[in-house]
């Protein structure tokens, strides 16, 4: 990884003290990073081995009682489910797994959500756009259910 590229934003934010590594978790990583930045990480392979429910329990356990901001990178999905991204990498999670995780975040005190890396020029059949819209919709539904 270069000193500054699309994959170093978290490293730079941590180095500048903008991210509390003890309160952070990254799920679904598939590329290797030499820098141990102190963030709890669950790779895509670990998710496949552990199962979606166990990973969700791990997420909830790690973040319970904290204020949570979710940043969802669409390329966590396997290119079969999200081909329209700038960095497709095989071995990602399925869209149903992403939806299960997003829906399962309901117990957390989430204050915001973003979804990034959708690239329409690479999304010829709008497969990625549909997945992204569904994920965002489900998160909005989770937030609405928290209000009631």
PLM region spans:
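Conserved alpha-helical scaffold segments that buttress catalytic/binding sites
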Residues: 1-148
């Amino acid at each position: 990884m270069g000193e500054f590229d699309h994959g170093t934003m978290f490293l730079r934010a941590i180095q500048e003290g903008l991210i509390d590594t003890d309160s952070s978790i990254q799920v679904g990583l598939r590329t290797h990073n030499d820098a141990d930045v102190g963030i709890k990480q669950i790779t895509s392979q670990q998710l496949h081995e552990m199962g979606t429910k166990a990973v969700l329990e791990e997420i909830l356990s790690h973040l319970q009682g904290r204020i949570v901001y979710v940043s969802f990178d669409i390329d966590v999905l396997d290119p079969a489910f999200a081909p329209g991204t700038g960095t497709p990498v095989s071995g990602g999670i399925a869209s149903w797994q992403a939806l299960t995780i997003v829906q399962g975040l309901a117990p957390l005190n989430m204050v915001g959500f973003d979804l990034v890396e959708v690239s329409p020029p690479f999304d010829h059949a709008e497969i990625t756009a549909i997945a992204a819209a569904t994920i965002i919709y489900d998160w909005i539904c989770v937030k609405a259910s928290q209000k009631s």
